[in-house]
Amino acid sequence: MKSRYNPVLIAIIAIGLIVSLWLNYQRHEIEQRNDTVEMAMEYEGLEHIANWEGLSLNDVLAGFKKAGVTSLVVFDTTLEKLNNNGSIVAVTGEELLKGSALGGDGGKFAPVLSEGIVVPNAVYVTVGTSYDVLTEVVEDLYLRYGKDRLRIVNNEPQIIEILGNPMVITEENYDSKPGVMQAPLGLSTEEMRKAKAFGFNVIVRPMNYLPNDYDKIRSIFRRIDKSGANVTGYIGCGREVVGYPDYIAYMAHKLKKQNMTFGMVEHYTQLQFAAMDGLLPLAEHMDYRVARTYIIDKAEQRKLKMPEALRRWALTDEERNIRINYIKPFMIPQEGRDILELNLDYVSKIADDVQARGYKLGPAGVFSKNTADGKFAPYFPERAWLVPLAFAILAGGIMYLTLLFNFSKKIQYMLLLTGGIVASVTLLKFGGILTRQLLALIAATVFPVLSMTVIVELWEFCKKNTPNTLKIIISATWQLALAVILSLIGASFVAAVLGDSSFFLEIDIYKGVKLTFILPVLLISLWYMQRFNVLSKGQIGNIAVHLKNFFSTRITVKHVAFLGVLAFVAYIFVGRSGHTAGVPVPALEIKMRLFLEQMMYARPREKEFMIGHPAFYLAAFAAYKQAPRLWQMLLVVGATIGQGSLVQTFAHMRTPVIMSYIRAVDGYALGAVLGIIAVIAVSILLPYVQKWQRRFLEHE
């Protein structure tokens, strides 16, 4: 076995492994410090509950504060909302003219009616219960519409005319541009002050100004300062972040100056973020002071019962590094409880679950290096640390190629030196995001294969004395542990080479997910055909000869049937990967996942414990019992699927690295149990199958 693996390459891989473990330890410390979850609900959502139930808003706010909500989300207010709560009085020109035609005097708007200056396609605004609110409205209207569309048409009382479409849009037409009544104005000082009075922090969601300029952005922060509220974060609203497209850097500057965190809402597919123009540039200008934010999709929540929704939050915080739980209330009674009681219980249980997993409640945590002054700093490892990783990963790739093509040591070293220098230059000089992605792909595809080649060679070495079933099970158990450890070398490389704030937040993502599932299967198949002359009728030659013989095989009906089964398996295998899978998950499997989530710290992946690891045990059984090579090869391919899945888990950079390691161990434990059951079942059934086979052949 020693002659097949270059000890120099092994030494380089060992050095890289030490570096990767050090970098992953640093990452673990950063993830451990990021331990605060913000529990957020919308101010207007709680206001809606109060109105719906006929309760005091003060009582509702106090109840949700006690239940565990730490922050209220405040949007830009609108003329429609302020008119509904009586702070101002707003009416369309068309309504005034119709009222006048019916004999009405216009009330507060009588002066403009009497002068005959009412424009149908306009909105007229005057004071309601608050002069302060009217003052803010006038300020916001000038910022949003400018002097050309706005004029004061009366002084006592002050009446403002805004030209524009006054139509109120229903929910069915939400994608239309809102009219003047529903268009965003600015943040409500009144709402932010009320949030402060009840002990809440505030997350603001102002909409972008069209067009934008420095003063309009400054107006947002003047309003925040005026309120005196503790505003901890900003989440975009609409289709653009504030400052898009030309003032993103300035918006980031103001957010950082206010010590605010940028909340980025996870996409409902759980892959990256809800689309918004300027989202990623703002995150970069914020130096990745970003909190991943989770909201249950509105359409999905309508289908959920409260207990189903409840189980998601703490698990999401732990597995996907969510740090803002953006909770929308249930607006339909459930379980015989009104919406206030239902939602108070919902929030309280979320808070309890989050804290039970070791998190604190408060302003959202962020990924930050441990700086001397305690200030925020994004985590990007020193580029020099990536150089030994690059050489180690390339050494693994060259080791595999040597198994196929029998490279001399001279060629191995030339390939390593050339590839290592190119990778090092791109990493040191440019940061090499593409190089890091490529290195991660090599590590994720090659090391599971190398792991299985070691095990197969071990089987070849040990199978001369065919053991009984018990000894096979014992051997396969420690051999699977060895395979997992060897695959974890590649997993550690993946986690280390991609480890920085942008990947932790999933702003950058690993791009080779589908290839990581397919390539190990292809690579182990090529190696196995080369090593054991499978499908070549005993003819010895290089990989090209084996492939030529393979593609020269006469196709029969049984081949077509086999390929059909293989295509279906591949469709399920690849189609179930990623976040936009076209293959639905059966209800029984969903229940099994829920059970495993409750029973284990990190639910293992089905490809490991249901496919890969049981196949490993059966492959060991087949090897020791000297089954036909084709059957051995198919089982080894199945075992490689498990090892590849194990490594691919570490490419989910938003998942804490320690959880990925524990997931691998959990997968090993559960897979070993199923594998042992599979071997026992086969060993019991095999004599009957062989007996039936002999009878069948006798009758032929």
Language-model segments: which ranges?
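Functionally constrained cores in energy, signaling, and assembly domains
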Residues: 26-27, 195, 317, 479, ...
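Alpha-helical transmembrane segments of integral membrane proteins
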Residues: 2-23, 393-700
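Intrinsic disorder/low-complexity detector
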Residues: 1-32, 37, 51-94, 115, ...
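Cytosolic-side membrane-insertion boundary helix
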Residues: 358-416
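Soluble extramembrane regions of membrane proteins in the secretory/endomembrane system
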Residues: 30-383
